[in-house]
Each structure stands twice: as structure tokens, then as C-alpha cells.
């Protein structure tokens, strides 16, 4: 079990799973993980890289699987990012910058589906609504057909997510 951080909505069922199935649990709050550390998962042929991504919480980590699937917990959401409970906005900015540096084809798997609400927020603060129209149409289609917009592609996040564009003067 790969845990991104120590919030109850992420860890609540872990004890039951561990008691029943006895999996290995990997996290950054009961053990020390390091940025860039490669994990070996028993019985799985996967390459998992640890990315330390503090900001939402101090111990938050993301997991990059096979250099193309990012399990980003509450650091990055579709069209948004997690609340900064640490009050360390520089750490969150650095964590988002680390995600921005990944290949644009990276598939991002946030822990929560907040994309539609985040898009409403973005269009309430960014007057350039036309910029988001195509993505909004795509989002409605995807949410209607499969009821989920995830995973999201980093290309779309780099283009539309205000929190990944905060250094853009426009």
C-alpha cells in the first residue's frame, strides 16, 4: 500500500487491509523516504520513484510509476491543488514545480475528483473564460460518460491549472 500522507481520508482503511491481506505499507510518516528513492514492490514488476512533495502536509509524497503514472495524493488535483495545511507555500510551490518538470505525457492520478469544482473556481477568478471553453466541454463529456475525469494528463494541467501557471505573467 502506497500512502501519500497521513490524513484519515487516506489512511482510514489501511489497518483493516493490513490485518486481512498483510501487504507492505510504504509511507513517509512511519519510515523515512528520500526524494528520488526507487522502490521495489514485492511481486510486482513496477518501477516506483518517490517524489517528496511537502506543502499539503509536511510528509506528503507522490509516487511516479514507470516514469509515466503519477499518484499525486493531495498535492495536485485536476485544475487545482491541495490546501496548504503546513502554511509553507514555498514548499507547495516547489512541489508543484517538481511535478511541472515531469514529462508532459505523464498521467496524473489525484486522490480526489474535484476537477469540475476547480474549473468553476478558476473561471470565477480568471476573466478569460474563452480560454477554458474547450476544456470545459471535454470535461462535461468525460464526466457524463464515465463520471470521472481522472486521470488527467499533465499537458492539460500545465495549460489550464492556475496553480501550475502562477509564474505566468498572463
Stretches found by the model and what they are:
Residues 1-4, 8, 21-23, 106, ...:
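Intrinsic structural disorder
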Amino acid at each position: 500500500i502506497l500512502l501519500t500522507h497521513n490524513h484519515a481520508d487516506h489512511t482510514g482503511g489501511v489497518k483493516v487491509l493490513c490485518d486481512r491481506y498483510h501487504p507492505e505499507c510504504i509511507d513517509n510518516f512511519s519510515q523515512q523516504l528520500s526524494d528520488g528513492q526507487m522502490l521495489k514492490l514485492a511481486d510486482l514488476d513496477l518501477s516506483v520513484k518517490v517524489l517528496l512533495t511537502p506543502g499539503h502536509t509536511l510528509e506528503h509524497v507522490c509516487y511516479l510509476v514507470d516514469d509515466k503514472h503519477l499518484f499525486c495524493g493531495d498535492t495536485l488535483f485536476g485544475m487545482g491543488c491541495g490546501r496548504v495545511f503546513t502554511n509553507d507555500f514555498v514548499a507547495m510551490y516547489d512541489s508543484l514545480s517538481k511535478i511541472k518538470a515531469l514529462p508532459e505525457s505523464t498521467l496524473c492520478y489525484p486522490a480526489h475528483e474535484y476537477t469540475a469544482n476547480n474549473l468553476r473556481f478558476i473561471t470565477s477568478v480568471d476573466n478569460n473564460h474563452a480560454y477554458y471553453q474547450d476544456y470545459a466541454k471535454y470535461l462535461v463529456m468525460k464526466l457524463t460518460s464515465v463520471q470521472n475525469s481522472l486521470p488527467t494528463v499533465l499537458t492539460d494541467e500545465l495549460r489550464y491549472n492556475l496553480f501550475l501557471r502562477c509564474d505566468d505573467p498572463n
